[in-house]
């Protein structure tokens, strides 16, 4: 089989021979040559078409092999459209043999262009007549080009775009066209789809994640079940699918396994369900509203009714009750429960409802919990392990509710006289981080008095928020150090959040012991207080307006405290010597040492300047502006002298010596060559200057003699288009 360049050369040879035979002298010789050439041309055309078809098939096979191996294809050169039209007989149906062979440079430019058009690019020779110039173009093409489907990655499947998952392979052949229409529009389908008979409503089930139902009839309600995560109901009978109403359609955000029985309207609205749901027969309307359920629900045989209480238990995390008692209304409201709930068989009253935000393990002792009052509800934000002693908790009062934001381990010892009373004192220690007292020594005067009296309880509550060790640097206040040392600071002047082991002394001092400067006493608690590492001038002045903030010492006392010296023993203090009326006032701090003026290195005075302040210095001599090149002022001086004549000046030198004329910097940088301005241009320049002189003379004459104002021209007037103005000039000149 011949190659394509040899084939094209043969065709060109035949055409050139035909053109040489056409120039024969006699008509009989030309007719004989034409008949012989036409017969040979028909045979040659059939043979060449067969070669082209065989070669095209072979090239397609080679392209498929190369595309499978991901190798770039190099196009073979194609025929020129003119010679292809000769083969097709579109140029009159005559083909002439050449007299002389044609050399290679006389061929089509496609032979030298490997990216030119070819017959293998399109299907038929008719389509290949139109040459598509793709030289330098044809970008953005990846893979094998077949027809007109560019930018296609992967395996194409008829009408199912955007289908992710396992497609059904058991469709009957009769319904394949209908299913192609329905399957096309099912966007965002993730998982395994249903493959029995389905109608058009199955098309629109958006955002389906998981395994769908396998019943035969899928109605319009199941179509729209959005955001379904998990395994749906797999009832096999057609009657079960009939119960799927509009309610089952809208069950949004379902995570877990749904029940396999009759799905009523209640199952529709259970939003945000995480875990395993109940699998009993009748799910009432109350089951609908239990939102945010995380964990395993009860699987007992409570088939009668689940009351409204079960419906409203929001934000339940963990394992719910599995007992068979009646669930009262109080059970409903235990919101935000994290951990394991109580599993005893006592009646839980309305007070248990409100223990919000409980993190950890609740009490599971066998004590009598019948009378847990309303106060047990309110222990909010408890993080850690609660009390697990077996004391009598009948009288847990209202104060147990309010111990807010306790992080760590609570007291697990026996409380005062059997732990019957927990008063305000335990409640009020806010924002305590660390380990509380866990000793069971009830002989301590301070602890016994604190737990038994509400007055000392108020004092315990006022322990301020203190973080560890204060700063001991002496001079400047660093905001950046404050940002690192107080990461959770809210109000800097509150001495916030104590980390470590706190020593409980009753009554406590109003401020913890610290050595160092009074850091955050005069800081503004705004949101920009930690933005700069230095104090502003205003803050520096405010420190001196109130008191000197730079001190070293130990603060041990309250405000207006009498009868106490600097070196008292804290362990031997008696609580009776403190007056309760001044407990919440902050007194002047005690200082161990001598307070003096702040230290300054050197003398504070005017700012220093190195050198003499004076006029700005200039290096060299200030002179006229510099010009790069040679200034040619011949024509410029002529123009200025013309201006001097217009202004009726006697001497042109006086005009050139004027300061206004000198101040006009010439708009020329460089050297002006003489050959740039020809004689013709110079003559036109002189003519323009003369016209300008005449125009200005006319304006001056009209303005001076007739006292008339003629507006000047704004812009630039071309010297070649002064026809109408010349008539006006001539009329004025005649006057």
UniProtKB/Swiss-Prot annotation:
<dbReference type="GO" id="GO:0007218">
    <property type="term" value="P:neuropeptide signaling pathway"/>
</dbReference>
<feature type="modified residue" description="Phenylalanine amide">
    <location>
        <position position="164"/>
    </location>
</feature>
<feature type="propeptide">
    <location>
        <begin position="321"/>
        <end position="332"/>
    </location>
</feature>
<feature type="propeptide">
    <location>
        <begin position="519"/>
        <end position="546"/>
    </location>
</feature>
<feature type="compositionally biased region" description="Polar residues">
    <location>
        <begin position="66"/>
        <end position="76"/>
    </location>
</feature>
<feature type="modified residue" description="Isoleucine amide">
    <location>
        <position position="610"/>
    </location>
</feature>
<feature type="modified residue" description="Phenylalanine amide">
    <location>
        <position position="359"/>
    </location>
</feature>
<feature type="propeptide" description="Linker peptide">
    <location>
        <begin position="259"/>
        <end position="267"/>
    </location>
</feature>
<feature type="modified residue" description="Phenylalanine amide">
    <location>
        <position position="499"/>
    </location>
</feature>
<feature type="compositionally biased region" description="Basic residues">
    <location>
        <begin position="142"/>
        <end position="159"/>
    </location>
</feature>
<feature type="compositionally biased region" description="Basic and acidic residues">
    <location>
        <begin position="438"/>
        <end position="447"/>
    </location>
</feature>
<feature type="region of interest" description="Disordered">
    <location>
        <begin position="33"/>
        <end position="212"/>
    </location>
</feature>
<feature type="modified residue" description="Isoleucine amide">
    <location>
        <position position="515"/>
    </location>
</feature>
<feature type="propeptide" description="Linker peptide">
    <location>
        <begin position="632"/>
        <end position="661"/>
    </location>
</feature>
<protein>
    <recommendedName>
        <fullName>MIP-related peptides</fullName>
    </recommendedName>
</protein>
<keyword id="KW-0165">Cleavage on pair of basic residues</keyword>
<feature type="propeptide" description="Linker peptide">
    <location>
        <begin position="412"/>
        <end position="426"/>
    </location>
</feature>
<feature type="modified residue" description="Phenylalanine amide">
    <location>
        <position position="317"/>
    </location>
</feature>
<feature type="modified residue" description="Phenylalanine amide">
    <location>
        <position position="209"/>
    </location>
</feature>
<feature type="modified residue" description="Pyrrolidone carboxylic acid">
    <location>
        <position position="494"/>
    </location>
</feature>
<feature type="propeptide">
    <location>
        <begin position="437"/>
        <end position="461"/>
    </location>
</feature>
<feature type="propeptide" description="Linker peptide">
    <location>
        <begin position="214"/>
        <end position="229"/>
    </location>
</feature>
<feature type="propeptide">
    <location>
        <begin position="715"/>
        <end position="735"/>
    </location>
</feature>
<keyword id="KW-0527">Neuropeptide</keyword>
<feature type="propeptide">
    <location>
        <begin position="233"/>
        <end position="249"/>
    </location>
</feature>
<feature type="region of interest" description="Disordered">
    <location>
        <begin position="381"/>
        <end position="400"/>
    </location>
</feature>
<feature type="modified residue" description="Phenylalanine amide">
    <location>
        <position position="142"/>
    </location>
</feature>
<feature type="propeptide">
    <location>
        <begin position="298"/>
        <end position="311"/>
    </location>
</feature>
<feature type="modified residue" description="Phenylalanine amide">
    <location>
        <position position="190"/>
    </location>
</feature>
<feature type="modified residue" description="Valine amide">
    <location>
        <position position="619"/>
    </location>
</feature>
<feature type="modified residue" description="Phenylalanine amide">
    <location>
        <position position="153"/>
    </location>
</feature>
<feature type="modified residue" description="Valine amide">
    <location>
        <position position="714"/>
    </location>
</feature>
<feature type="modified residue" description="Phenylalanine amide">
    <location>
        <position position="467"/>
    </location>
</feature>
<feature type="propeptide">
    <location>
        <begin position="503"/>
        <end position="509"/>
    </location>
</feature>
<feature type="modified residue" description="Phenylalanine amide">
    <location>
        <position position="407"/>
    </location>
</feature>
<feature type="modified residue" description="Phenylalanine amide">
    <location>
        <position position="383"/>
    </location>
</feature>
<feature type="modified residue" description="Isoleucine amide">
    <location>
        <position position="669"/>
    </location>
</feature>
<feature type="propeptide">
    <location>
        <begin position="387"/>
        <end position="401"/>
    </location>
</feature>
<feature type="modified residue" description="Phenylalanine amide">
    <location>
        <position position="255"/>
    </location>
</feature>
<feature type="compositionally biased region" description="Polar residues">
    <location>
        <begin position="101"/>
        <end position="125"/>
    </location>
</feature>
<feature type="modified residue" description="Phenylalanine amide">
    <location>
        <position position="274"/>
    </location>
</feature>
<feature type="propeptide" description="Linker peptide">
    <location>
        <begin position="674"/>
        <end position="705"/>
    </location>
</feature>
């Amino acid at each position: 089989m011949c190659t394509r360049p040899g084939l094209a050369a043969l065709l060109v040879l035949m055409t050139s021979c035909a053109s040489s035979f056409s120039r024969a002298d006699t008509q009989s010789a030309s007719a004989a040559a034409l008949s012989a050439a036409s017969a040979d041309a028909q045979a040659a055309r059939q043979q060449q078409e067969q070669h082209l078809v065989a070669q095209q098939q072979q090239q397609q096979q080679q392209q498929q092999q190369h595309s499978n191996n991901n190798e770039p294809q190099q196009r073979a050169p194609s025929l020129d459209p003119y010679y292809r039209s000769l083969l097709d007989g579109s140029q009159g149906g005559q083909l002439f043999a050449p007299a002389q062979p044609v050399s290679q440079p006389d061929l089509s430019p496609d032979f030298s262009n490997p990216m030119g058009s070819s017959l293998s690019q399109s299907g038929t020779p008719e389509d290949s007549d139109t040459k598509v110039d793709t030289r330098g173009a044809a970008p953005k093409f990846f893979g094998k080009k077949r027809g007109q489907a560019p930018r296609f990655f992967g395996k194409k499947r008829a009408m199912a775009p955007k289908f992710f998952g396992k497609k059904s392979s058991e469709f009957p052949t009769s319904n394949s066209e209908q299913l192609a229409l329905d399957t096309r529009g099912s966007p965002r389908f993730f998982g395994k789809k249903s493959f029995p008979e389905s109608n058009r409503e199955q098309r629109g089930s958006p955002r389906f994640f998981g395994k769908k139902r396998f019943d035969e009839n899928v109605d319009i309600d199941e179509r729209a079940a959005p955001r379904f995560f998990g395994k749906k109901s797999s009832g096999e009978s057609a009657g079960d699918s009939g119960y799927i109403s509009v309610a089952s359609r809208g069950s949004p955000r379902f995570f877990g396994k749904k029940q396999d029985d009759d799905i009523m309207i209640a199952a529709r609205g259970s939003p945000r369900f995480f875990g395993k749901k109940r699998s009993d027969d009748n799910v009432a309307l109350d089951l609908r509203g239990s939102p945010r359920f995380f964990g395993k629900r009860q699987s007992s045989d409570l088939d009668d009714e689940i009351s409204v209480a079960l419906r409203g238990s929001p934000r339940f995390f963990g394992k719910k009750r599995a007992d068979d008692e009646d669930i009262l209304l109080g059970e409903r409201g235990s919101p935000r429960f994290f951990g394991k709930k109580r599993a005893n068989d006592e009646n839980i009253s309305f007070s248990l409802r409100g223990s919000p935000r409980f993190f950890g393990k609740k009490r599971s002792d066998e004590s009598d919990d019948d009378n847990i009052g309303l106060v047990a509800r309110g222990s909010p934000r408890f993080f850690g392990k609660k009390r697990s002693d077996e004391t009598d908790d009948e009288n847990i009062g209202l104060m147990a509710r309010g111990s807010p934001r306790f992080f760590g381990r609570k007291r697990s010892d026996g409380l005062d006289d059997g732990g019957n009373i927990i008063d305000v004192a335990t409640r009020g220690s806010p924002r305590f981080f660390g380990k509380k007292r866990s000793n069971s020594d009830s002989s301590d005067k301070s602890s016994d008095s604190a737990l038994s009296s509400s007055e000392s309880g108020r004092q315990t509550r006022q322990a301020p928020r203190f973080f560890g060790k204060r700063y001991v640097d002496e001079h400047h206040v660093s905001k950046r150090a404050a940002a690192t040392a107080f990461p959770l600071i809210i109000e800097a002047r509150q001495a916030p959040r104590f980390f470590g082991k706190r020593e409980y002394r009753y009554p406590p001092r109003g401020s913890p012991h610290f050595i160092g400067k009074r850091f955050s006493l005069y800081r503004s608690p705004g949101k920009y207080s930690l933005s700069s590492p230095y104090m502003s001038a205003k803050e520096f002045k405010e420190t001196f307006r109130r008191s000197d903030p730079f001190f070293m010492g130990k603060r041990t006392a309250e405000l207006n405290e009498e009868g106490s010296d600097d070196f008292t023993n804290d362990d031997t203090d008696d609580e009776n010597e403190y007056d309760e009326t001044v407990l919440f006032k902050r007194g002047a701090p005690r200082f161990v040492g001598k307070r003096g003026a702040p230290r300054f290195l050197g003398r504070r005075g005017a700012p220093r300047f190195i050198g003499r302040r004076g006029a700005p210095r200039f290096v060299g001599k200030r002179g006229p502006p510099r010009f790069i090149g040679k200034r040619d002022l011949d024509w410029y001086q002529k123009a200025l002298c013309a201006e001097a004549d217009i202004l009726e000046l006697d001497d042109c030198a006086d005009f050139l010596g004027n300061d206004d004329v000198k101040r006009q910097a010439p708009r020329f940088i460089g050297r002006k060559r003489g050959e740039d301005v020809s004689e013709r241009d110079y003559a036109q320049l002189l003519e323009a200057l003369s016209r300008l002189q005449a125009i200005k003379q006319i304006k001056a004459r009209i303005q001076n003699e007739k006292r008339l104002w003629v507006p000047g021209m704004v812009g630039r007037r071309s010297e070649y288009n002064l026809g109408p103005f010349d008539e006006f000039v001539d009329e004025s000149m005649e006057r």
